[in-house]
Amino acid sequence: MLARDEISNEILRRRDMRDAFTFTIDPADAKDFDDALSFECLAVAESDGLGHTWERSVRGAVCQAQPVYQVGVHIADVSHYVRPGTKIDEDAYKRGTSVYLVDRVIPMLPEELCNDKCSLRPGEDKLCMSVVFTMDADARVLKYKICRTVIRSDFRLNYDEAQDVIMANQTGETLSRENRNGGDTGGKASLKQALATLNTLAQKLRAERIANGALTIEQDEMRFRLDEKGHPTEIYFESPNEAHHLIEEFMLLANRTVAKAVGSGRPFVYRVHDLPNGEKLEEVKAFKRKMGSRVTQQTIDLLTIRAQAKAVYSTYNIGHYGLAFSHYTHFTSPIRRYPDLMVHRLVEKYILTGKPCPLTREELEDKCQHCSACEQEAAQAERDSIKLFQAIWMNDHIGEILPGHISGVTEFGFFVQLDESRCEGLVHISNIGFPGETWQYDEKNYRLVCAENHLSYTLGDPVTVKVRKCDINRALIDFELAKNA
């Protein structure tokens, strides 16, 4: 918790939002809570023809005739603690990002910051960088303010608990689970009202993005349960629900708003996503037309993702294709992404104090490229970690016969993703067909074809495989086709 004198000193330079109804929603196993939402319902008091005067209503109460909402997106103010040129800053820059492996997290910042000073725990005064929106019932932003704040969270929820509250609002059921952790006795009604309204606003924001051409491909996240020795005992999957979408949409709104607020002509850190590979997309479309109902949407989604460009950090704004945004940045996770910390510092210079950036565009671009490289290395490490634990898991299932689908085709065989565990392994070309047969790789049609009898194995085909062997040191799984497969 922050010392009283630090709060007393900081509140003079910040917007005091400790009375705003505020909560966090995070994964159940999260240890740091670096973003929060606040919600208040405002009423239109009068209009003078030039603008509106807003009158704050009772905390969290239901609005009457003309609902107008104040929604705050509050991000832990890491830049207050991590100053440029310090050892902590240098180490964070070298890492570029936190790395999330199956059995551990390698944090970008020290634990004292992640899990204490910058963790927005309920009932504690915390320093934030915030984007505070005034929105109408159609999710239109009437005005916004980017500012440094002091907040005090009322509730800490995980995604399942938040979803329970949302569903209770939709079905009229009694709220079954709640985690006050410092919330007041009137918090239940306020929380239900806040989540109900925010969920409606988020759905409208999401619908607008999709209408503008945003990609909406969603994939379940593979998770492992480990025993006390770190051995996987279960593989399970987490699917995005309305609570995930709620948080996602308001984080996207904050990121986009900050990027637009900076304007053009000043060096800035954008998150950009170029157009996809047109030739690859045409191949995907042709494949879909040819296969018709024989190909699943999951396979088409997989190919569409593979055709996309990689999102990167850059001072050159080309927009974000996947989100259908003309301006976009990363502002909402400075505790785990160094570019967000750079953005917070630039916001302080440009918007809060009106000072110029101390770095040239070339220097800032070098930092962007470094952070993009760190991100890609971290993503590869995370993929490798998942593959390792898949191999450990499948090593306990040698000899089992299991159903799956072809998830990738190459000149040396094809990959199969098992239907239940979704572990992926290789059926090598030497284990396909009969001795003497020649298998040819048809790259455009994503298949292997036998030259002698034209039998083929195509991306997305259902197959039954036998777990042949696992190389844990190399994180590799080998399958062979089951007899009569």
Predicted region positions:
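C-terminal structured domains
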Residues: 452-454, 458
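Short, structured beta-strand/loop micro-motifs enriched in basic residues and often containing a Trp
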Residues: 441-450
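Electropositive polyanion-binding surfaces
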Residues: 2-435, 440, 460-485
